[in-house]
Amino acid sequence: MKICILPGDGIGPEITAEAVRVIEALDLKFEMEEALLGGAAVDATGDPYPEATRKLAREADAVLLGAVGGPKWDTLPREQRPERGLLGIRKDLGLFANLRPAILYPELANASSLKPEVVAGLDILIVRELTGDIYFGQPRGLEVRDGERFGFNTMHYSESEIRRIGRVAFEAARKRNRRLCSVDKMNVLETTQLWRDVMIELAAEYPDVELSHMLVDNAAMQLVRAPKQFDVMVTGNMFGDILSDEASMLTGSIGMLPSASLDANNKGLYEPSHGSAPDIAGQGIANPLATILSVAMMLRYTFNQENGALRIENAVKKVLAQGLRTGDIFEPGTTKVGTKQMGDAVLAAL
């Protein structure tokens, strides 16, 4: 079982180091190899997704990523920016399904910006299509038309693209509370009219899953008004990008949230939902829990090691119950710790 480790930029190397320690502690005989992606790869090779990384990622069963990006590289040509490395590896590995849980741990209820009674017990999974939609549609560009600047993008989805992400979402809902909400904008966008039609057709294959539909503007409002009505949500690339970030902040800290991006065979790229946080890089204060929980997702979805996944998740719960907190989730009455101390505590709980 091979894992490609991509520490990336900013706090990436610090948080992946703790996740690797957790993997090693599981004694599941993983073979791990490290490579460059993002800004670190640009600095070393001039390419955000070098050929050596491409080869290693293709050969691995799973990829663990820290984070990419930072202001240092913002002035580079678009094709050389760190984020192009992330887009490149997603496309190269055929990763079309992004799974992002938004879970509020009881110990962190006060960290949420919403009232505790609104978010207590929150446990949502957002399934986002990753390879289609307006982010990748052609034609796109910037031109001058009729003497003024003109920008354009193209939104499109094929039936097969919608069907395959729909299956991932229905299967995920089947393993949870059997409720799936499909989010679209079918009242004005033909692309999402097709999305809704295909989801309705798929529902016939999953009679044990309750399917509902919601327009994206209403979904954004409902996530803040009454988020616990949702179990699994499925949506397209752009809507999912926005809604998953919104859902993540219901929990109080994006530093707690893992994510998985899967191909058709459950080979996956696993990473924390947060960014590279260059402002705190190298200080040893970043929260490694989202990356550690990403390892739990890796065990569950790619390696079918449910017991290992639960061990990690229970260890994180135990550490939180002990009152240990990194700065992003610290509150009076708890104990502030750094990145390595948090990793030590998770290892001890394991």
From Swiss-Prot:
Transmembrane segments: none annotated. Pathway: Amino-acid biosynthesis; L-leucine biosynthesis; L-leucine from 3-methyl-2-oxobutanoate: step 3/4. Keywords: Amino-acid biosynthesis, Branched-chain amino acid biosynthesis, Cytoplasm, Leucine biosynthesis, Magnesium, Manganese, Metal-binding, NAD, Oxidoreductase. The keyword Transferase does not apply. It holds the Pfam family Iso_dh. Its EC number is 1.1.1.85. It catalyses: (2R,3S)-3-isopropylmalate + NAD(+) = 4-methyl-2-oxopentanoate + CO2 + NADH. The record marks Y135, K185 as: Important for catalysis. Mg(2+) binds at D217, D241, D245. Binds 1 Mg(2+) or Mn(2+) ion per subunit. One of its GO terms (molecular function) is magnesium ion binding. SMART domains: Iso_dh. NCBIfam families: leuB. This is 3-isopropylmalate dehydrogenase. It comes from Aromatoleum aromaticum (strain DSM 19018 / LMG 30748 / EbN1) (Azoarcus sp. (strain EbN1)).
